[in-house]
Amino acid sequence: MNARGGDTASIVIVGGGLEGVATAWALGQRGVTDVVVCERDTVGAGMTGKSSGIVRCHYGVSSLAAMAATGLEVFEKAEEIFGTDIGFRQTGYVVGVGSANVDNLRKSLAAQREVGVQTEEIDRSVVAELWPAADLDPFAAFGWEERGGYGDAYQTAQAFAASARAAGIRIRQSTAVTELLVDGEKVTGVQLADGSTISADTVVVATGVWTRPFLAAHGIDVPIEVHREQIVMIHPGIELGAVPVFSDLVSLQYVRPDVRGEILFGNSDLAELEGADPDNYLNRADERFLDLTVDKVGTRFPAFTDAAITSSYAGCYDVTPDWNPIISAGPLDGLVIAAGFSGHGFKISPAVGRLVADIVIDGHSTDPRVPETDFRLSRFAEGDPLSTRFPYVGAGEMR
């Protein structure tokens, strides 16, 4: 207890979503356990459970590809690391491009291999065996990650949290943080909604879609926009068998199998962005998106003649101007920001936790493949966004 009757900790993490508890887990793995996670609801109750859960390392930004590779290694060893099933299913991942993107696909695959990603180009005939229901005529080349697949972000968050608790880290649910405590240019803790405080040397803000307004109250502009993302579940009407995740960069859609025999559909067309209030948005696909689903899925998978939409849901992405995250020391001493994941957060979450832990403990990344400067907040004000070296026509920011 401090003199004001509040709590104390070396580190406070604001936000008990996936990235917040991944950070707690990573700190615990490094022996730093005087940590309190403050979550206004319950662990993973925000946008974590809305993730489509796709696991792939196919990024044109090398540091992101490396982070995804780290995430994959953790997911593969989940039973050993966490002692529980986190819902990871290793179906494989295929990405298909049209003729305009063949050269950049090959360059991207080569760059991914340089940072340890197991990936290769495969022939159309192989993809036809993997996805016999798909019309592959519009595609000119395909990339393949045998170790890719999909997972369950909510289950993964619970595993991170359980591991952190086992290490001695405190996770306080139903504990809303209203503001930072600041003395001059130094963060000294957080103020809670119940009027109490937690004093701390370091505060990690991992508040996702709520980050911009939270930090704006302290004069810190974090350029994050909130976009509603819609997902549709489809029963294909046929027995699919074991099919991989399929990222279609011709019609800009992605599908993945589901344990119930359904497929999950998402749209990856950046022309379809929709701003949203994360506290008041439509939590299902609208009629326009359902029509889009029927059109895109019907075109790519003509064998789905008896397909039926079974359900839908929506969540919100915290999107930065360059569609890459902010994992950075903030403008106040002792402040670290981990937000703006732009739809990439689940697959890289173990690496996010480790990078934040590095920044807190060492002041820099300990993984040479992942320079912390790539994700610095200041890059936007400097006019130096983080961009893929090998953009795809129509989907550059998403890769």
Place the predicted regions along the sequence by residue.
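Beta1/beta-strand and adjacent pyrophosphate-binding region of the FAD-binding site
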Residues: 5-19, 36
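Glycine-rich FAD pyrophosphate-binding loop
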Residues: 28-48
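Dinucleotide-binding Rossmann-like beta1-alpha1 core, especially the glycine-rich loop
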Residues: 52-130, 252-254, 297
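Flavin (FAD/FMN) cofactor-binding and adjacent substrate-gating region
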Residues: 74-77, 97-167, 172-173, 179-186, ...
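Conserved beta-strand-loop-beta-strand element in the redox core of flavoprotein oxidoreductases
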Residues: 178-198, 203
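Central helical "cap/lid" subdomain
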Residues: 194-244, 367
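Active-site lid/adjacent beta-loop-alpha segment flanking the redox-cofactor pocket in flavoenzymes
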Residues: 236-334
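C-terminal catalytic lobe of FAD-dependent flavoproteins
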Residues: 295-399
